[in-house]
Amino acid sequence: MRRAYAVLLALVCALAAALVTAGPAQAAAQTITNGTQFTDTSGNALHAHGGGVIKVGSYYYWFGEDRNADNTFKYVDAYRSTDLKNWEFRNHVLTQSSASELGTAYIERPKVIYNASTGKFVMWMHKENGVDYSEAKAAVAVSSTVDGSYTYQGSFQPLGDNMSRDITTFVDTDGTAYMVSAANENYDLHIYKLTADYTAIDSLVANPWVGGHREAPALFKRNGVYFMLTSAATGWSANQQQYATATSITGPWTAFTNVGDSTAYNSQTAYVLPVTGTSGTSYLYMGDRWGNSFGGTVNDSRYVWLPLTFPTTTSMSMASWYPEVSIDTAAGTITGTSATYNTLIARNSAKCADVPNQSLWQGIAISQYTCNSGTNQKWWFKDLGTGYYELMGRGSSLCLQENSTNVTQENCTGATTQQWSLTTSGSYVLVKARTSGECLDVNGASTANSAAIITYTCSGATNQQWTRGS
């Protein structure tokens, strides 16, 4: 009996020790809704705009901009996750009180790299005076812990007089670190080698695209080939992303080649994250859909994440928009959810269900408008497998929601007010709200543009009959 008790006690102690020493739970595959403003594990808006990611142990740490309402610098925030979906807020790692020159400033595109020789985490960023963009400086901060408070080292123009705006950083396999920045009023992209401690510029090693007018660089290496992904310089507005390649970081580099659609699916490059697991390494495009481009601020921005693919060793593709992206950090796989988008055409008016003014804001009431193939008239009928569908807008990534007096677009939550059934009525369909049982209806059977779309007692009238167009 005593021997059995001793064995049981040993097993309990071993289990307790294992629990104490265990790391974070193994991440499971996660599905992320694209083109939305993410939230952290406390339900707060996640502000890591223009940011970058570093992996430390089992955690991915995401750093980015958290700004004031006037877009001036407030914080650089740090979050961590094992699965790239569930992000825990860790710290405001850099604040206005970190240095006097940060009291009124713009701090943009913070990137953190780790120096194995010094044991320090080094943050590089773009710094301006908070009034205009005349300073064009790089800035540096350091910390002994990845998510601790960073000590600000100051700001400067590289090598004394080179302008420095949008930046990124990269640590090569030999431990050499580089900083890339938009220079010469954004007409050049400079590639700088950093000093051994990563806190200063050692030398300018390449200026491959003189006069190219590119910004928002992201640099990564795949199978011995360097890829530089950039955007054109059009302020907050999205534009055509392009990439170039080289087998040496100092060049020669190729000319730029288009990737993605003409607006990078309404986003701008922030970072490219390698995700390595048991099945290999995949590459995640991380972009910002800037709030300033649709009447908001930086903190209203949405995140656009897409898988990058590589048809050859020196080519890259971002060929499709996916409303959802599934990431398995354990396997190292990233896949997009393919979706067919349809218009929803009212029989009585031959007009389309439309998000007015291509708005990306929640709470916007849906109306009808002349069909024009805009993304604000395209809807993904996401089959929930329960006899109901969510209707997600292609342009906004928001879901059609029934309210007491109108139908609006809102953050997709899975609520029953966002679930709809389809009933065939001849060659048309009735779209019925799950909560009320009422049908999607053009108010007053109007044929005019901007007439409200509501829900109303199902009658089978032509203003409740719809076709799903291409």
Q: What are the language-model segments listed below?
A:
Residues A27-Y341:
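Carbohydrate-active catalytic/glycan-binding domains of CAZyme proteins
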Residues G336-S470:
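Lectin-like carbohydrate-binding module/patch detector with strong preference for beta-trefoil
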Residues M1-A27:
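Secretory targeting and sorting signals
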Residues T21, T72, S117, S134, ...:
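Short loop/turn segments at connectors of secondary-structure elements within structured domains
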Residues A10-L11, A17, T21, N86, ...:
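Generic detector of low-complexity/intrinsically disordered segments
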Residues Y5, T31-T33, D40-S42, F170-D172, ...:
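A short linear-motif detector with a strong N-terminal bias
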